Each structure stands twice: as C-alpha cells, then as structure tokens.
C-alpha cells in the first residue's frame, strides 16, 4: 500500500511537504536577511550591524529569532510533529542557524544543520535543518552556481544533501536563484542557467538510481510558470503529463487560481517554490508520494496567522 505525502504551502515564504501515515513535513522558509549583529570584514554586512543604517542590534535580532521560532513551532503544532527537513535562504552564517534550533520551542525537534559558507557578496547563504531521527543523512555538498556567460559571477551555492526517509533514497537541493535586478527579462538568463544546472544534477542522480526521490526548493525569484522553471528545469505543470524521470512544479495551479507567496502591485507571485521528481509526485517507486492537502484541490494550503502580518513599512498587510 502506498503511503501518502501532502504538501502545504504557507504563503509566508515556506512550503510543507508531508510523508507517511502521520505525515512528515518538509519546509522551505525564506528568512529574509537574517544577519547576526557582528560586522564581518569578509562580507558586505554593514547594513545589518548596530552602527549600520538598520541599527541592527541584539534586541532586533532576538525579536526576529523569536518570530521565526513562533512560525516554525506553529507549523509543528498543526499535527504535533516537527517538520523533518527545513530548507532556508537568506541566513548569514551557522551561528544564526544554531540560535534558531536552540530556541526553547524548537529544541525538542533535535535539529541538525547542513550549511556551508557561499561566495555571495553580502554573506547570505542557504541551509538545511533536519531531524536525524527521520531523515538519515548520508552526504552533503555545496555546488557552485555557474552562469556560463558570466564566469566571474558570484552568488549563493546550490546546497545538496542526500540520505533516506523510511529506507527510501532522497536527494534535496535548496537554492536562492539570481534576483530580478535590472528587470525580469534582462536577468532571466541567469535563472534559466541555474535551472539547467539543477536539472543536470537531478538527471545525474536519477541516472545513478531511478528510485531516488528529489525535492528542489528555494527562492527562485520566478513563478512556477516562468521559463526558468518550465524550460531551465524543464518541469511539467500537470501531474497527468509526467513520465519517469520528469520533474513536477505543483504550485502552478495555485498561482493561476490567484494564490501567492508575495504580492507586487495587484498580482500575486509564487517565487518560493518546490519542484519534485515524478516518482515522488506519483509514487511510481517506493511507498512515499504526495497528496493534496485536506479539504483542498491543490497540493498546498494557506498557513497565515495574525502575528505574521507586517503592520508597518513598505510591506505592511
């Protein structure tokens, strides 16, 4: 009998994917410039220091830390189970990650950290937090992001980690794709290039073991219907179109229905994405597969609490 996996998209820059009879959650959470307060001379983090323009001090740091703890614990409280894998972006260093997993409400999750410093100018990285009691880590590696036409371009790495869940092989990637600086069309070639690179990694993994289930996540700075995902990653947008070895972008239908993870003007976008392999989408190998969220026609749902609403500033509402 196939076990089920359901995905919940939280529209607070995270996605939850659940496996097993009591679902496991896999989350992506954009931490939005989570810097420590210490000036690192090796990176451009002056803005987020007590002397910088944001006056980033210990009180502000601890407030953000508490908010992140509250969000992640609120997610765990849905079914009284901590997420098994949490991918994050825009975090400065391992010390910040250690502070997150040590918060009183998250410490019982006994999280381990997968993190490497990347060459990004401001020093922000991607990382994974994972529960070793469920995800059995076998390896991890930061892959340098390559833009062929810009050999000196430095950005966040593609962090990969692999292991097993219930004895089934899993391969995770988390990435923060190049921004839309200069405009979507002008910058699109960079995101397409990273999409192709991640597709190449996925193809190599599946060639070595077609039973491996792949989960890609991150801030892609593009919607699931954009070229970087449909052409760069080559992801399909409909479950019925999937064949062995394909990739599936499950949140295109939610975007078309008017949902999103961020709003610009009068339109919603889903820049925070997951893309998964066909065998995880359809359960064509093993016992783990996705399922629709309870009471939803989508592979997702909305997690929104009053304390997540920004009440002032440019992004209030």
Predicted segments with their positions:
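Bacterial Sec-dependent N-terminal signal peptides
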Residues: 1-23
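N-terminal, active-site-proximal structural segment of metallo-dependent hydrolase catalytic domains
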Residues: 19-104, 108-110, 114-126, 301, ...
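Structural recognition of the beta-strand scaffold that forms the well-ordered cores
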Residues: 25-28, 84-89, 112-115, 126-130, ...
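Catalytic metal-binding/acid-base residues of hydrolase active sites
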Residues: 32, 92, 178, 220-223, ...
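Second-shell loop/turn segments in exported
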Residues: 50-59, 82-88, 115-116, 147-149, ...
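Structured beta-strand-rich core segments of catalytic domains in phosphoester-bond hydrolases
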Residues: 91-171, 175-177
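Extracytoplasmic, non-cytosolic globular domains
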Residues: 115, 159-254
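Metal-dependent phosphoester-hydrolase catalytic domains
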Residues: 204-214, 222-317
């Amino acid at each position: 009998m196939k076990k089920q996996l359901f995905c919940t998209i939280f529209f607070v820059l995270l996605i939850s994917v659940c496996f097993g009879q009591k679902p496991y959650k896999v989350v992506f959470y954009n931490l939005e410039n989570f810097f420590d307060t210490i000036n690192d001379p090796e990176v451009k983090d002056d803005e987020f220091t007590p002397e910088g323009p944001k006056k980033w001090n210990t009180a502000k740091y601890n407030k953000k830390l508490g908010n992140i703890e509250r969000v992640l614990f609120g997610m765990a409280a849905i079914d009284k189970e901590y997420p098994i894998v949490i991918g994050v972006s825009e975090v400065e260093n391992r010390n910040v990650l250690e502070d997150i997993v040590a918060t009183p409400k998250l410490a019982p999750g006994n999280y381990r950290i997968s993190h490497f410093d990347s060459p990004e100018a401001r020093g922000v990285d991607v990382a994974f937090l994972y529960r070793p009691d469920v995800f059995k880590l076998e390896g991890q590696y930061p892959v340098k992001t390559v833009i062929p036409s810009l050999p000196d371009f430095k950005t966040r790495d593609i962090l990969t980690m692999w292991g097993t869940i219930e004895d089934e092989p899993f391969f995770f990637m988390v990435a923060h794709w190049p921004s839309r600086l200069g405009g979507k069309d002008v910058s699109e070639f960079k995101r397409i290039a990273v999409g192709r690179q991640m597709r190449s990694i996925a193809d190599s993994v599946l060639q070595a073991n077609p039973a491996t289930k792949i989960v890609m996540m991150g801030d892609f700075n593009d919607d699931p219907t954009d070229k970087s995902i449909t052409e760069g990653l080559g992801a399909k947008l409909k479950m019925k179109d999937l064949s062995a070895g394909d990739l599936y972008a499950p949140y295109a239908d939610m975007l078309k229905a008017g949902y999103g993870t961020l709003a610009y003007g009068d339109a919603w976008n889903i820049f925070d994405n997951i893309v998964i392999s066909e065998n995880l989408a359809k359960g064509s190998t093993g016992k783990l597969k996705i399922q629709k969220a309870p009471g939803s026609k989508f592979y997702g749902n909305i997690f929104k609490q009053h304390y997540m609403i920004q009440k002032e500033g440019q992004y209030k509402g």
